[in-house]
Design a protein with these regions (language model features):
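A positional/architectural concept
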Residues: 20-51, 60
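Surface-exposed amphipathic alpha-helices with a cationic face
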Residues: 45-50, 90-97, 117
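Substrate-recognition element of Asp-dependent hydrolases with the DxDx(T/V) motif
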Residues: 45-69, 79-80
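Glycine-rich beta-to-alpha transition loops that act as phosphate-gripper elements at the mouths
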Residues: 59-63, 104-110, 127
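Conserved Lys-Pro-Asp/Glu-containing loop-to-beta segment of HAD-superfamily phosphomonoesterases
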Residues: 89-113
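Single conserved hydrophobic/aromatic residue that forms the stacking wall/gate
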Residues: 123-135
């Protein structure tokens, strides 16, 4: 078991594709991604909110269905079409008076890397990404 001190964490920010949905995404007839969402993730998000954590979604995806799904779960901060996620990260922090070390970021791809470096905790593949890219 990994033991993290999460006592100062006030928020969790999630990417969507590959994190809250499968990384292999089929397309519909219009070329739009058809995302599958794990019901257990929804329960976990609601539980985290119930315990006072602020939850945010930060995705490069632009489909309004993403917003609807997470607003239905009570997530107020759903950021779509995030081309440069660090800008959205900074705006989110400023809006709620948060510091980097108070936020967990969960991402899995190159657009997440810069934010992962700022976050108090970041998960998923930071070291794997770091070994593959140069920014």
């Amino acid at each position: 078991m990994i033991n993290y001190d999460l006592t100062q964490i006030r928020a969790i920010v999630f990417d969507v594709d590959g994190v809250l949905s499968c990384s292999t995404i089929p397309m519909d007839s219009r070329g739009e991604p058809v995302r599958t969402i794990n019901i257990k993730d929804g329960y976990a998000i609601q539980l985290a909110e119930k315990h006072g954590l602020r939850i945010a979604i930060m995705t490069g995806g632009h489909n309004e269905d993403i917003r609807l799904r997470y607003e239905y779960l009570g997530v107020e901060d759903v950021y779509l079409s995030c081309a440069v996620k660090v800008r959205t990260w900074e705006a989110f922090k400023e809006r709620y008076g948060l510091r980097d070390e108070e936020i967990v970021y969960v991402g899995d791809d190159i657009p997440d890397y810069e934010v992962m470096q700022l976050a108090g905790r970041s998960e998923e593949h930071t070291s794997e990404l770091q070994s593959r890219i140069t920014i």
